Amino acid sequence: MSKPLRLILFDVDGTLADSQGAITGAMAEAFEGAGLNVPPREAILSIVGLSLPLAMRELAPNHDDATIEALVEGYKSSYMLSRQAAGAAHSPLYPGAREALAQLHEVPEYLLGVATGKSQRGLDALIDAHGLNCFVTRQVADHHPSKPHPSMILTAMAETGADPDSTVMIGDTRFDIEMGRAAGVTTIAVPWGYHDAATLGADYLIRDFAELRPLLAEIWKE
C-alpha cells in the first residue's frame, strides 16, 4: 500500500534564505527616499513575514495611504535593484538548507512547498538564482491575505491533496507559526531567523537543518 502524501511548507526569508541585510538595506532606502527616519533594525526585522503594505503600516503607523504606497514602491525598487546586482549572494541560503531540501525531495511521498510574504517576482528570482526546482506549490503574498491568515497553507493543501495531519509549516517568525496553527497543521520553528524561536510556541524546534528529516519521520511515525 502506498504511503500518504506529506506536505512540507517552508517560509523563505529567515528560514531558507538569509535576506536580513537585503531587507534592512531596502527598507532604509525606502524610508530615506520618502524623507522619513529609518526605523530601528529590530523594528524592521520584527515585521518580516508580513505583506509589504501591512509591514509599512506597522513601521509608519501615523502616515497616510500615499506615504505608505510610496514606501512600498520604494522598497520594491531598491530590493529589486540590489537583487539584480548581487545575484545569488543577495539572499544566500542558510547552511544546510540546500542539502536538506535535496534529501527531502528524494522521498517519494514528500511534497515540498513555500508559503512566503515575498512577491511572486521576488520568489521566482530567488528560486532561479539558487536553482531550487523542488517546490510543487509556491504561495506568495501577491495572491493571499498577509500572514498569519491561513490562506497560503489552505491553498497549498488544496493544490496537493494533503490534509492537515500530513502537513507541516516551518518558519522563523510568529507570523509563520500563527499561520500554521490557524490552518491546523504541525508547526516547526527555526532559531536562525528574525524572531526568538523559543517564544514562538511552535510544536517543535530544530537547531539545524540536519534535524529536520529525522523529526519529520518521528512526527509521521515512519
Residue spans of the language-model regions?
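Well-ordered alpha-helical segments embedded in enzymatic catalytic cores
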Residues: 96-100, 152-155
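Hydrophobic residues in well-ordered beta-strands that form the structural core
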Residues: 18, 114-116, 189
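N-terminal helical cap/lid subdomain that shapes the substrate entry/recognition surface
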Residues: 3-12, 16-99, 105-108, 120-121
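Asp-based, Mg2+/Mn2+-dependent phosphohydrolase catalytic module
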Residues: 1-8, 120-222
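Structural motif
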Residues: 47, 115-117, 170
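Surface-exposed amphipathic alpha-helices with a cationic face
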Residues: 101-106, 177-181
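A generic structural signal for short
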Residues: 16, 89, 111-112, 141-142, ...
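A generic structural motif
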Residues: 108-111, 183-185
